[in-house]
A protein has these predicted regions:
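Long, contiguous, secondary-structure-rich segments that constitute the structural scaffold
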Residues: 49-65, 69-173
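Long, low-complexity segments enriched in small/aliphatic residues
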Residues: 1-52
């Protein structure tokens, strides 16, 4: 059996997948691989304001899972508010130590409502925990345009200073 599409063939795209090397943001400056998966507590960003999603948050922030070894190396404890960052942006989240992840990998679900701490800042920082400020704004291929959220390298550190309030659910003035 052979499946073909004349319409797709007409696009002139390569017939086979190709290897896309990691972006320039990876490496020693940003040694952790971010998994930005679909959330278990809401449907994408729908119902982020709902009881199930809100109950999963820590100090009003989305949980980020991190291996205990990576957390210890950075002075991060369970429940600490942390800042994830790379050259694209930053976001705040709450650390959850987990042996379910390999060292060098952290996991922060997508779908948290974007809440810019300072909308005028050169580099965006979401105070609520949306990983989209860290990922490339590029689809996985010219055909699929899928999420490239699994191709993101970051660093993480304890957040110091006053914790900004989450205003994502506040109505406009």
């Amino acid at each position: 059996m052979e499946i073909a599409s004349a319409a797709i063939a007409g696009f002139g795209y390569p017939e086979h997948p190709v290897w896309l090397p990691p972006s320039a943001a990876s490496g020693s400056r940003f040694p952790l691989q971010l998994i930005a998966n679909q959330p278990a507590t809401r449907l994408h960003s729908q119902l982020d304001f709902g009881a199930t999603s809100q109950a999963s948050k820590i100090k009003d922030r989305e949980p980020v899972r991190i291996h205990p070894r990576d957390a210890a190396a950075r002075g991060i404890g369970d429940g600490d508010i942390v800042q994830l960052y790379n050259d694209r942006g930053a976001c705040l989240a709450a650390a959850v130590l987990s042996d379910a992840l390999r060292p060098g990998v952290i996991q922060l679900s997508t779908g948290t409502w974007y809440d810019p701490g300072d909308p005028a800042a050169d580099k965006p920082m979401c105070v609520h925990g949306n990983p989209n400020v860290l990922t490339r704004d590029a689809g996985t291929s010219r055909l699929a345009q899928g999420c490239s959220g699994q191709l993101t390298s970051v660093e993480i550190e304890r957040f110091e200073g006053p914790l900004p309030p989450v205003k994502a659910f506040d109505p406009p003035p």
